[in-house]
Amino acid sequence: GFRMDVIDMIAKEPRAKILVNGPHLHEYLHEMNRQTWRNRDFLTVGEAWSASPEDARQYSDEQREELSMVFQFGHLWADRQVGGEKWEQRPLDVAQLKQALYACQTTMATHGWNSLFWSNHDLPRAVSRFGATGQYRELSAKMLAIALHGLKGTPFVYQGEEIGMTDCPVATIDQVNDVEARTIYRQLRAQGDDAGTAMQKINIFNRDNARTPMQWTAKQHAGFTTGKPWLAI
């Protein structure tokens, strides 16, 4: 298959201040479909942060000949502050999460197709975000897997999710590789946060959480390498 990054931005018109869902977006995708993957047996999935369930149905309706499906992220706002920054977390609103998942299932019940996911290379680990990392880590991982695989759509299992890998909090900014997190840290310090408070916020949505080496064994460096890994485990 073929994943398309931020596909909802390919028709942006900056002068008109249109950055997503530009007027020619679906026209471009239809042309791309006809000229490249049409009549070929592979999957196409587009990343579309701006997509509503209705938008996702347009992208993935077979009759429109655009994409197989898109990643749309409505369910991942259930623990975020509306209009806030990405590190401004709030307690998980389970009702909102259920409503978002239900909307996707019903909107694409007959036309279009769902992608199913909890996490990716830019998001925190699902168990740390939606479950528990201590005594109930294994049960949390199983619960999230059952919830995901019980829905209609194509499931995407991010590496490490199948064994319940968790976030890897760090103590200082020197331990962070994620360039976005380092930039946000400087901004938080400039706004008056002390180092400890800034790191608490960074650890919530630091993209390094999803980019630590895959854990294969209980040996040093989780059996991933005999050398020095790029991130701590």
Task: Annotate each language-model stretch with its function.
Residues 1-233:
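Active-site and adjacent substrate-binding regions of carbohydrate-active enzymes
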